[in-house]
A protein has these predicted regions:
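Structural detector of well-ordered beta-strand residues that form the stable sheet scaffold
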Residues: 17-21, 69-70, 142-144
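Active-site proximal loops enriched in glycine and acidic residues that flank catalytic Cys/His/Asp
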Residues: 110, 145-147, 169
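Small/polar loops that bind or transfer phosphate-bearing groups
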Residues: 4, 20, 145, 167
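Single conserved hydrophobic/aromatic residue that forms the stacking wall/gate
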Residues: 1-11
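Charge-dense, low-complexity intrinsically disordered segments
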Residues: 3, 45, 119, 201, ...
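C-terminal alpha-helical cap/extension of soluble enzyme domains
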Residues: 150-225
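Glycine-rich nucleotide/cofactor/substrate-binding loop typically near the N-terminus or early
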Residues: 16, 20-22, 177, 186
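Alpha/beta enzyme core
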Residues: 9, 22-137, 151-162, 173, ...
């Protein structure tokens, strides 16, 4: 159940977006109704014809309400039931078909996966990314599974049109590591160190530090000014 989200300019001095990640067709409509400012429709598991049909419908609805919309072509790999699936490389022509619908951002599989990358990961397919960029023009491309991708690959991906990079697992790992150190140091046993606000504070600060580091790497600092 998703409740109504009310936004206030007093929350933060920078521009904010409440974005749905990997939304289903039904989930997108729920989040639109709830007040999200941006949605992602992940139709990559549908045949391309159905992905196009559903994306086209959601583009019209989102833009009528002033929302941005991200779409996906080519499944992003990841771990499920202990098995790591390697990411697919999207068909550049299918990417163009989705981009031509007027989406604001396009997530395309280029060998990237969610979560930790296995030792035998072959890396990003820059050949695929280059082909997609040439066919989609100025379309902002999205790279999911940003955790663990080497810096040189990140920078090359940005040079080839990637404008949004998702990083989640690395933030979670930073949080877990900082929280673990707090407890192992016995700080939860000092005074009211067991208070969740104190117990979780180091983890929250660790996430902030990780995000700051990524913003600097991605060239995102100062873009909201």
């Amino acid at each position: 159940e998703i409740s109504r989200c009310d936004w206030s300019s007093d929350v933060c001095s920078s521009d904010l977006a409440l974005h749905l990640d990997h939304g289903t067709y039904e989930g997108c409509y729920k989040c639109i109704k709830a007040g999200f400012t941006s949605i992602m429709f992940d139709g990559s598991h549908y045949p391309i014809e159905e992905n196009v049909e559903k994306t086209k419908e959601l583009v019209a609805v989102a833009h009528q309400l002033g929302l941005s919309i991200e779409a996906e072509v080519g499944s992003i790999g990841g771990e499920e039931d202990g098995v790591v699936g390697m990411g697919e490389c999207a068909d550049p022509n299918e990417c163009k078909a989705i981009a031509d619908l007027g989406v604001d951002m396009l997530a395309a599989g280029i060998g990237n996966i969610h979560g930790k990358y296995p030792a035998n990961w072959k890396g990003l397919s820059f050949e695929t990314l280059d082909s997609i960029q040439k066919l989609t023009g100025q379309m902002p491309l999205v790279l999911h599974g940003g955790t663990g991708i080497p810096e040189d690959m990140i920078k090359k991906a940005i040079s080839l049109g990637v404008a949004k990079i998702n990083v989640n697992t690395e933030c979670q790992l930073s949080f877990a590591d900082a929280t673990r150190k707090y407890i192992e140091a016995g700080k939860d046993l000092e005074g009211k160190g067991f208070d969740p606000r104190k117990l979780l504070a180091p983890g929250a600060e660790a996430i902030k530090a990780t995000v700051k580091e990524k913003m600097e790497l991605f060239g995102s600092v100062g873009k909201a000014e």
